[in-house]
Amino acid sequence: MPRKGPAPKRPLINDPVYGSPLVTQLVNKILLDGKKSTAERIVYQALEQAREKTGTDPVVTLKRALDNVKPALEVRSRRVGGATYQVPVEVRPGRSTTLALRWLVTFSRARREKTMVERLANELLDASNGLGAAVKRREDTHKMAEANKAFAHYRW
Protein backbone atom coordinates (compact mmCIF):
# COMPACT_ATOMS: atom_id res chain seq x y z
CA MET A 1 0.00 0.00 0.00
CA PRO A 2 1.23 3.53 -0.71
CA ARG A 3 2.53 5.39 2.31
CA LYS A 4 1.84 8.88 1.05
CA GLY A 5 -1.91 8.56 1.49
CA PRO A 6 -4.61 8.88 -1.11
CA ALA A 7 -3.90 10.72 -4.34
CA PRO A 8 -5.24 14.29 -4.31
CA LYS A 9 -8.47 14.92 -6.21
CA ARG A 10 -7.92 16.63 -9.55
CA PRO A 11 -10.06 19.74 -9.97
CA LEU A 12 -12.96 19.32 -12.40
CA ILE A 13 -13.12 21.87 -15.20
CA ASN A 14 -16.54 23.45 -15.68
CA ASP A 15 -18.07 22.57 -19.03
CA PRO A 16 -17.94 25.31 -21.69
CA VAL A 17 -21.69 25.47 -22.46
CA TYR A 18 -23.39 25.48 -19.04
CA GLY A 19 -20.41 26.26 -16.79
CA SER A 20 -21.32 23.42 -14.44
CA PRO A 21 -18.98 20.75 -13.04
CA LEU A 22 -21.96 18.36 -12.83
CA VAL A 23 -22.38 18.48 -16.61
CA THR A 24 -18.65 17.73 -16.99
CA GLN A 25 -19.04 14.71 -14.70
CA LEU A 26 -22.04 13.52 -16.68
CA VAL A 27 -20.09 13.82 -19.94
CA ASN A 28 -17.25 11.78 -18.42
CA LYS A 29 -19.71 9.08 -17.29
CA ILE A 30 -21.30 8.86 -20.76
CA LEU A 31 -17.85 8.63 -22.36
CA LEU A 32 -17.09 5.37 -24.22
CA ASP A 33 -13.81 4.45 -25.95
CA GLY A 34 -12.38 7.94 -25.40
CA LYS A 35 -14.93 9.58 -27.72
CA LYS A 36 -15.40 12.75 -25.73
CA SER A 37 -16.92 14.86 -28.50
CA THR A 38 -19.60 12.19 -29.04
CA ALA A 39 -20.30 12.08 -25.30
CA GLU A 40 -20.56 15.89 -25.17
CA ARG A 41 -22.95 15.91 -28.14
CA ILE A 42 -25.18 13.30 -26.45
CA VAL A 43 -25.26 15.18 -23.13
CA TYR A 44 -25.83 18.64 -24.64
CA GLN A 45 -28.59 17.42 -26.95
CA ALA A 46 -30.25 15.52 -24.08
CA LEU A 47 -30.14 18.63 -21.88
CA GLU A 48 -31.55 20.69 -24.76
CA GLN A 49 -34.38 18.16 -25.17
CA ALA A 50 -35.06 18.38 -21.44
CA ARG A 51 -35.22 22.19 -21.76
CA GLU A 52 -37.75 21.93 -24.61
CA LYS A 53 -39.97 19.52 -22.68
CA THR A 54 -39.92 21.36 -19.33
CA GLY A 55 -39.17 24.95 -20.28
CA THR A 56 -36.73 25.25 -17.37
CA ASP A 57 -32.95 25.51 -17.14
CA PRO A 58 -31.54 22.03 -17.90
CA VAL A 59 -28.86 22.32 -15.19
CA VAL A 60 -31.64 22.85 -12.63
CA THR A 61 -33.40 19.75 -14.01
CA LEU A 62 -30.12 17.79 -13.74
CA LYS A 63 -29.59 18.92 -10.14
CA ARG A 64 -33.17 18.01 -9.21
CA ALA A 65 -32.74 14.59 -10.85
CA LEU A 66 -29.48 14.03 -8.95
CA ASP A 67 -31.09 15.03 -5.64
CA ASN A 68 -33.80 12.42 -6.26
CA VAL A 69 -31.26 9.70 -7.14
CA LYS A 70 -28.43 10.36 -4.62
CA PRO A 71 -28.35 7.67 -1.93
CA ALA A 72 -27.90 8.67 1.72
CA LEU A 73 -27.14 5.11 2.90
CA GLU A 74 -25.69 1.98 1.36
CA VAL A 75 -24.66 -1.45 2.61
CA ARG A 76 -21.09 -2.69 2.65
CA SER A 77 -19.99 -6.26 3.30
CA ARG A 78 -18.13 -6.83 6.55
CA ARG A 79 -16.76 -10.20 7.55
CA VAL A 80 -17.05 -10.97 11.26
CA GLY A 81 -15.96 -14.42 12.37
CA GLY A 82 -17.20 -16.77 9.68
CA ALA A 83 -20.20 -14.69 8.67
CA THR A 84 -20.46 -11.83 6.21
CA TYR A 85 -22.83 -9.05 7.24
CA GLN A 86 -24.31 -6.32 5.07
CA VAL A 87 -23.53 -3.28 7.23
CA PRO A 88 -25.39 -0.03 6.50
CA VAL A 89 -23.10 3.01 6.22
CA GLU A 90 -23.65 6.64 5.28
CA VAL A 91 -22.53 7.63 1.79
CA ARG A 92 -20.01 10.46 1.47
CA PRO A 93 -21.27 13.43 -0.60
CA GLY A 94 -18.83 12.90 -3.47
CA ARG A 95 -19.63 9.21 -3.68
CA SER A 96 -23.37 9.83 -3.61
CA THR A 97 -23.08 12.20 -6.60
CA THR A 98 -20.90 9.71 -8.46
CA LEU A 99 -23.33 6.85 -7.75
CA ALA A 100 -26.30 8.96 -8.84
CA LEU A 101 -24.63 9.86 -12.16
CA ARG A 102 -23.56 6.25 -12.70
CA TRP A 103 -27.09 4.98 -12.09
CA LEU A 104 -28.61 7.62 -14.37
CA VAL A 105 -26.28 6.65 -17.22
CA THR A 106 -26.67 2.88 -16.63
CA PHE A 107 -30.45 3.02 -16.61
CA SER A 108 -30.49 5.45 -19.55
CA ARG A 109 -28.58 2.87 -21.60
CA ALA A 110 -31.09 0.18 -20.62
CA ARG A 111 -34.12 2.17 -21.80
CA ARG A 112 -36.09 1.36 -24.96
CA GLU A 113 -36.00 4.71 -26.79
CA LYS A 114 -34.30 4.86 -30.17
CA THR A 115 -31.33 7.17 -29.53
CA MET A 116 -29.12 7.67 -26.49
CA VAL A 117 -30.07 11.36 -26.49
CA GLU A 118 -33.76 10.49 -26.02
CA ARG A 119 -32.95 7.84 -23.41
CA LEU A 120 -30.80 10.19 -21.33
CA ALA A 121 -33.24 13.09 -21.63
CA ASN A 122 -36.21 10.94 -20.57
CA GLU A 123 -34.32 9.31 -17.69
CA LEU A 124 -33.29 12.78 -16.44
CA LEU A 125 -36.89 14.02 -16.67
CA ASP A 126 -38.22 10.89 -14.95
CA ALA A 127 -35.62 11.20 -12.17
CA SER A 128 -36.36 14.91 -11.68
CA ASN A 129 -40.03 13.96 -11.21
CA GLY A 130 -39.17 11.18 -8.74
CA LEU A 131 -39.83 8.37 -11.23
CA GLY A 132 -37.65 6.04 -13.29
CA ALA A 133 -35.30 3.13 -12.73
CA ALA A 134 -32.51 5.22 -11.16
CA VAL A 135 -34.84 6.49 -8.41
CA LYS A 136 -36.04 2.92 -7.84
CA ARG A 137 -32.40 1.83 -7.45
CA ARG A 138 -31.90 4.46 -4.74
CA GLU A 139 -35.04 3.30 -2.92
CA ASP A 140 -33.87 -0.33 -3.13
CA THR A 141 -30.48 0.68 -1.70
CA HIS A 142 -32.19 2.48 1.18
CA LYS A 143 -34.46 -0.53 1.81
CA MET A 144 -31.40 -2.80 2.02
CA ALA A 145 -29.80 -0.44 4.53
CA GLU A 146 -33.02 -0.30 6.56
CA ALA A 147 -33.39 -4.09 6.52
CA ASN A 148 -29.82 -4.52 7.81
CA LYS A 149 -30.04 -1.81 10.47
CA ALA A 150 -29.43 -4.49 13.13
CA PHE A 151 -25.82 -4.78 11.93
CA ALA A 152 -25.13 -1.03 12.11
CA HIS A 153 -22.94 -1.53 15.19
CA TYR A 154 -20.38 -3.32 12.96
CA ARG A 155 -19.74 -0.02 11.17
CA TRP A 156 -16.11 0.99 10.71
Swiss-Prot record:
GO terms for molecular function: rRNA binding; structural constituent of ribosome; tRNA binding. InterPro entries: Ribosomal_uS7, Ribosomal_uS7_bac/org-type, Ribosomal_uS7_CS, Ribosomal_uS7_dom, Ribosomal_uS7_dom_sf. Keywords: Ribonucleoprotein, Ribosomal protein, RNA-binding, rRNA-binding, tRNA-binding. GO terms for cellular component: small ribosomal subunit. It holds the Pfam family Ribosomal_S7. One of its GO terms (biological process) is translation. PROSITE patterns: RIBOSOMAL_S7 (PS00052). It comes from the Bacteria. Part of the 30S ribosomal subunit. Contacts proteins S9 and S11. Belongs to the universal ribosomal protein uS7 family. One of the primary rRNA binding proteins, it binds directly to 16S rRNA where it nucleates assembly of the head domain of the 30S subunit. Is located at the subunit interface close to the decoding center, probably blocks exit of the E-site tRNA. This is Small ribosomal subunit protein uS7. It comes from Rhodococcus erythropolis (strain PR4 / NBRC 100887). The gene is rpsG.
